Amino acid sequence: MAPCSCKSCGTSCAGSCTSCSCGSCSH
């Protein structure tokens, strides 16, 4: 999986993840 990017909140998650929300990422 590609890294998650939460553009609306300006946050990002390094590495692979299954879901991305404002300020947090689930692996």
Curated annotation (Swiss-Prot):
The keyword DNA-binding does not apply. One of its GO terms (molecular function) is metal ion binding. Residues 1-27 are annotated as: Disordered. Residues 1-18 have a biased composition (Low complexity). Keywords: Copper, Metal-binding, Metal-thiolate cluster. Cu(+) 2 binds at C6, C25. Cu(+) 1 binds at C4, C25. Disulfide bonds: none annotated. It comes from the Eukaryota. Cu(+) 6 binds at C13, C20. Signal peptide: none annotated. Cu(+) 5 binds at C9, C20. Cu(+) 4 binds at C9, C22. Cu(+) 3 binds at C6, C22. Belongs to the metallothionein superfamily. Type 8 family. This is Metallothionein-like protein CAP5. It comes from Colletotrichum gloeosporioides (Anthracnose fungus).
